[in-house]
Amino acid sequence: MLEILPIQTKPEQEALCARASIPYRVDAMAYRASVDGEITAVCQFSMDAEGGHIHDLAMVKDKEFSDRDRIESLFVMGRAAMNFIDLCGVHKAYFEDTAFEPEGMIKSIGFEKLEDGRWFVDLTDFFVEPCQHGHGLNKA
């Protein structure tokens, strides 16, 4: 069963970032994904005056996972971070992980590429109206 949980301590966050080969961001909040008790992925995110920022969304590198576990872990964890950002009253979010592939996953999570190349989503009513996702309604 897939679980997405906040990482409770900075040492745990740092260790999971090392397992995912991503930089540890001491000032970022973080979630971890697990499937059947096995940690699969980590997400680091933050908020500032500009909006929410998903800095990293990555699988741990020390174990192989099925495509299903990989896709579900990344998609649901990305959406969980977006929902937390939205619940904090921050209604703009940016996907900042420039090394993340494939772009299709970023789009399926809900982000759209702006003219400047940044990935953006307007979270206003995003979780109220799920049918709007992916239809060009998320503009900066």
Residue ranges and their predicted role:
Residues 19-60:
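A conserved beta-strand-loop-helix scaffold within acyl/acetyltransferase catalytic domains
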Residues 52-117:
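Acyl-donor binding region in acyl/amide transferases
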Residues 1-25, 130-140:
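Short amphipathic alpha-helix that is part of the acyltransferase structural core
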Residues 32-46, 94-140:
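Terminal substrate-recognition subdomain of acyl/acetyltransferases
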Residues 1, 17, 38-43, 77, ...:
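Generic preference for well-ordered secondary structure
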